[in-house]
Amino acid sequence: MKTDENHLYRCRKSDFYSKTPRGSCAIALPREEIEVALVDINERRLSYITRIAQRIFAENGIPIERITATTDRRAVLGGSQYIFISILVGDIEAIRKDIEIPLRYGVDQCIGDTIGPGGIFRALRTAPVILDICRDIAELCPEAFVFNYTNPMSILCWVVKEVHPSLRFYSLCHSVQHTAKQIAEYMGWPLEDLEYWVAGINHQAWFLELRLRGRDVYPLLREKAWDPEIAEKDTTRVEMLKHLGYFVTESSGHNSEYNPWFRKRPDLLQRFTPGVGWNGETGFILKLYGKDRESYEQELERIASGAEPLSYEESEEYGMKIIYALEGGGIFRANINLPNRGTITNLPPQCIVEVPCFVEKGRIRPAFVGDLPLQLAALNRMVVQSQEMAVRGILEKCRDYIYYALYYDPLTAAVLSLDEIKRMVDDMFEAEREYLPNEWYHS
């Protein structure tokens, strides 16, 4: 298997604040004491990120000796308190298979990293590696807080909690923050004055409440949905707002894959996924991952060498703010992915939900949400039931459950018959053999 694995942070008695150079990965800058270990099996990539981290430390008066870089995670996991996981298993060719094989059958995906054929096969590739990492964490630093940024977030988190239920494993995404910023821009509101309460599942959470300086402004957003200029910018989410009454997280192109309404016919694709990129372009993920690697590495070299200035701005990502709160820096509220266990009362208790959580010294407490509006819970449950069968298939190495997961996937089921889905899955298993564990091929 081919994997990129990076960013393990180890810290003690630290006072953190978060800075983001050029929108890249957030690095915590300590005022007292911190040790940072960076892990990547790609030595070239590890060299770049290590030099960038050293530059950030040096520019902020932090001894660079506190940074360790290694390709061996077990060498640095012992004593770790906070761990970030961001990996990719397989290369651009694996992702190409995720997109192009379903497309031959008529299943048109924009990103394909969350559910659907692409998301589920990404999970099949990624889950064994995540479980290996978590096995080492359970052995070497079982009390660590583990924050996963890897997709498909919900499936991976669910798999880990089934195998390591006591591990403090959480998944973090930025779709809530990004959506809040987009809403503020659409409406001309100051983001700092916007208050919101969001809950659901990853990439399909719902803005349940929306207030501006304490005033309910959801009626204004619903009215704005009929503005053609806004609808053109955010097609599928605005259409769902019109019909379901609530705004959903994640971009319109990504969102279009998680339901049966927008990508099942050419005329619907033309209507609801116009333009390019995140608004629903077919196979857009291949452009994202297929960028000119030489130019990308040249940019990393310019940053690492100091040829390009670093602009320090507060990160949108939750990670460092969560650590700050866990270290006693006050209470911080963030939307975090974790097992439901009654937080959302009309979703299954074992599923992974994305809900408001209160982070304070030494612990993370999910807020009680209660019932989602029925029309929202119904769509979440469609996705959750597919996730659950994918999780069962991964844990049991049972291909039947992968068939079932895609039989009930909202987009796939809207396009294909049962026998077509089965043939597609078999084609994907055969095409991705080099990326998957041998157990999938023994039956």
Residues of each region from the PLM?
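An anion/phosphate-binding loop that grips the pyrophosphate of nucleotide cofactors and donors
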Residues: 80
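Rossmann-fold NAD(P)-binding glycine/threonine-rich loop
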Residues: 89-164
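Conserved beta-strand elements of the Class I
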Residues: 5-7
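Short acidic low-complexity segments
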Residues: 66-77
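Histidine-anchored nucleotide/phosphate-binding helix
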Residues: 17-29
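Rossmann-fold dinucleotide-binding core
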Residues: 145-214
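Glycine-rich phosphate-binding loop and adjoining beta1-alpha1-beta2 segment
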Residues: 27-62
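Long, compositionally biased stretches enriched for glycine and/or charged residues
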Residues: 188-443
